[in-house]
From Swiss-Prot:
Belongs to the alpha-IPM synthase/homocitrate synthase family. LeuA type 1 subfamily. This is 2-isopropylmalate synthase. It comes from Wolinella succinogenes (strain ATCC 29543 / DSM 1740 / CCUG 13145 / JCM 31913 / LMG 7466 / NCTC 11488 / FDC 602W) (Vibrio succinogenes). Its main location: cytoplasm. Residues 392-519 are annotated as: Regulatory domain. Keywords: Amino-acid biosynthesis, Branched-chain amino acid biosynthesis, Cytoplasm, Leucine biosynthesis, Manganese, Metal-binding, Transferase. PANTHER family: 2-ISOPROPYLMALATE SYNTHASE 1, CHLOROPLASTIC-RELATED, HOMOCITRATE SYNTHASE-RELATED. Mn(2+) binds at D15, H201, H203, N237. GO terms for biological process: L-leucine biosynthetic process. GO terms for cellular component: cytoplasm. It is found in: Cytoplasm. One of its GO terms (molecular function) is 2-isopropylmalate synthase activity. Gene3D superfamilies: 1.10.238.260, 3.30.160.270, Aldolase class I.
Length: 519
């Protein structure tokens, strides 16, 4: 007998992006969307089309780039939001509008200032309007976790009649315990029957998002909304990888249920989201944390070596992580072998990107004895970022900090111009680097976060630097990435990358403004 499928609705690009510091540009969102498609996600919530021109543009481009997953836009239960969602989804092969309105007493009274009957009327009108654009429409009861179940039944019956095919029950503030959420879903499942698919969207404020989601699946939910790495505002959302691997690992509990997720793509998806957002899972994070398959205890190590199942309930290879990080290529490896390795790692690159990445790889071979998969992933992530290079780092020179206040001299090449050289003194080498780049670009940035980590083990490991920089007050911080064996060079590259992203975003916003003024 074939298993009943649980739909995986990924909202990394919408709810996940609401995590502080996790903002992404359009090209980065497209890369994540294509990886989610490889992962086998059923529905990709690509954004909130009415929120900004940037969100609209990203959804539209993702809709063109992805064909195997349904592309979804969120919309409030108002016509202009729904129209924006429909327009942004026009290029999509498979598309869905996800509209919502709050249903809890506190939200209806204080936020909406509407009566329950007015809320039902608004919801029905929203579904009917969304259905005029496309067949697949989802409805969410915002703050359902604190809503009256009797009222939930009333509004769900009305939106089913209006044409909603999926009914989402969010625990918006992460308030409910598993048995409570399970009881709500069980009662609603018995009421709805096969008239629509029940969905859940659990937040992690009490650390229960995954537990609540799994309990709801057992109680009748057949779609679960989640994010890669549990990314999301406040304490985050239910983690996709934990839900999927729980269903896969506990066949004794979920035996008749399955997902379409290709679990071999879980690790690659986790790493991509972490690299782009700069938010890495904590080391002891289930499934994808770097300690998830590590055994330090001698007793545990002995048991695992004798028989893996003594202390491991799943294999690292199940999520696409090599159990031994193998040395993959060396200085004598050719372009063909490098291309095969890229394909094996799940990357799709253009001819130009392949050449650029291969050149970086050969240069790294001269600096490093052993090249690992993680080195190549890091190089590819940088070379496929598609951020316009308004400024390109040519070189840096740093003074000896022990001789007094350090200074940095930097050479940048501006697009279509000659090289520019300048220098500045700072409170440390990093500060001196950033001040010099600010002087050259004549744009002042304020550093909000700075992280450095080794890509692999060993003294000759590549340094990966992530910076978050605010170039304008009250605007989201821009993320920049830098990769080099020399940490200071990686730092300078990361800051220049953030600057280029900012300039690209500013140009895009300027074009959008001009278009709106013409209209």
């Amino acid at each position: 007998m074939s298993a009943e499928m649980i739909k995986i609705f990924d909202t990394t690009l919408r709810d996940g992006e609401q995590s502080p510091g996790a903002s992404m540009n359009t090209e980065e969102k497209i890369r994540i969307a294509k990886q989610l498609e490889r992962l086998g996600v059923d529905v990709i919530e690509a954004g909130f089309a009415a929120a900004s021109p940037g969100d609209f543009d990203a959804i539209s481009k993702i809709a063109s780039a992805v064909s195997e997953s349904t592309i979804c836009s969120l919309a409030r239960a108002v016509e202009k939001d729904i129209k924006a969602a429909a327009d942004s989804l026009a290029p999509a092969k498979l598309k869905r509008i996800h509209t919502f309105i709050a249903t809890s007493p506190i939200h209806m009274e204080y936020k909406l200032r509407m009566t329950p009957s007015e809320v039902i009327k608004r919801a029905v009108e929203a579904i009917a309007y969304a259905k005029s654009f496309m067949e697949d429409v989802e409805f969410s009861c915002e703050d359902a976790g604190r809503s009256d179940v009797g009222f939930l039944k009333e509004i769900l019956a009305a939106v089913i009649e209006a044409g909603a095919g999926t009914l989402n029950i969010p625990d918006t503030v992460g308030y409910r315990l598993p048995h409570e959420m399970g009881a709500i879903i069980k009662e609603l499942h018995e009421f709805v029957g096969n008239r629509a698919i029940l969905s859940v969207h659990c937040h992690n404020d009490l650390g229960l998002a995954v537990a609540n989601s799994l309990y709801c699946i057992q109680s009748g939910a057949r779609q679960v909304e989640c994010t890669v790495n549990g990314l999301g505002e406040r304490a985050g959302n239910a983690a996709l990888e934990e839900i999927v691997m729980a269903i896969k690992t506990r066949r004794d509990i979920f035996g008749g249920l399955d997902t379409r997720i290709n679990t071999k793509e879980i690790y690659a998806s986790s790493q991509l989201v972490a690299n782009i957002t700069g938010i890495r899972p904590q080391p002891n994070k289930a499934i994808v944390g770097k300690n998830a398959f590590a055994h330090e205890s001698g007793i545990h190590q002995d048991g695992v070596l004798k028989h893996k199942e003594t202390y491991e309930i799943m294999h690292a290879s199940d999520i696409g992580l090599g159990e031994q990080e193998s040395i993959v290529l060396g200085k004598h490896s050719g372009r063909h072998a490098f291309k095969d390795k890229i394909k094996a790692l799940g990357f799709e690159v253009s001819y130009e990107e392949l050449n650029a990445a291969f050149d970086r790889f050969k240069a790294l071979c001269d600096q490093k004895k052993e090249i690992y998969d993680e080195d190549i992933r890091a190089i590819l992530a940088e070379e496929t970022s598609h951020i316009p290079k308004v400024y390109e780092l040519v070189g840096i020179q740093l003074s000896d900090c022990s001789m007094g206040r350090p200074y940095a001299a930097i050479t940048l090449k501006k697009e279509g111009s000659e090289e520019i050289v300048d220098a500045a003194i700072g409170n440390g080498s990093v500060d001196a680097l950033f001040k010099t780049i600010d002087r050259i670009s004549q744009i002042k940035g304020e550093l909000k976060d700075y992280k450095v980590e080794a890509v692999t083990q060993g003294k000759d490991a590549l340094a990966k630097v992530v910076v978050k920089v605010e170039f304008e007050e009250n605007k989201p911080a821009i993320i920049g990435h830098g990769l080099h064996i020399d940490t200071m060079l990686a730092t300078a590259k990361a800051y220049v990358g953030a600057l280029n992203s900012y300039l690209s975003m500013r140009e895009l916003m300027g074009k959008k403004k001009c278009e709106e003024e013409r209209i």
